Swiss-Prot record:
This is Sex-regulated protein janus-B. One of its GO terms (molecular function) is protein histidine phosphatase activity. The keyword Membrane does not apply. JanA and janB regulate somatic sex differentiation. Keywords: Differentiation, Sexual differentiation. GO terms for biological process: cell differentiation; sex differentiation. One of its GO terms (cellular component) is cytosol. Substrate binds at residues 42, 110-112. Belongs to the janus family. The active site is at 69 (proton acceptor). Pfam families: Ocnus (PF05005). The gene is janB. The keyword Kinase does not apply.
Length: 140
């Protein structure tokens, strides 16, 4: 009888693991965390998730040398929507990427999406192997 009670608990314990390791959520891992260009960029801090699984999101940084942050957002949607991934903008700003001297400066705000958490952006950039050795300064 004890064995049957133990087995009845199994579905409740397995269900969260099924959600974590489903093929929908694995598609988030295939999205690069950082995509920025050299020089002065506008950037967005974006929380991505598969539709219906907002708890299991991932934060990414996207930047480009464009006229406004909406252009970056449009390119993010073009990249992610075919994969069934939703995007929520957490804010934006500017990044001065001096790749030759291995320095970066994160500052400013987006008029459209508001200010991003620049410290969080710095942590994401430093976790990325390309920018691990960079000296990254933040100005709020």
């Amino acid at each position: 009888m004890k064995m049957f009670k133990s087995l009845s608990l199994l579905p409740r314990n397995v269900s969260p693991f099924q959600k974590c390791y489903s093929t929908d959520l694995i598609s988030l891992v295939g999205v690069p965390r950082v995509k920025i260009t050299k020089g002065q960029n506008r950037y967005l801090l974006v929380n991505i998730h598969t539709h219906g699984f907002t708890k299991y999101g991932r934060v990414i940084v996207r930047g480009a040398d464009v006229d406004n942050h909406l252009t970056i957002f449009d390119s993010i949607l073009e990249e992610l929507e075919p994969q069934g991934i939703c995007a929520k903008i957490l804010g934006g700003g500017r990044i001065l990427n001096e790749a030759d001297s291995k320095k970066m400066k994160i500052y400013g705000t987006s008029r459209t999406f508001g200010s991003a958490d620049h410290t969080r952006t710095r942590n994401i950039l430093q976790s990325w192997t390309t920018y691990k050795d960079f000296k990254i300064s933040v100005k709020n």
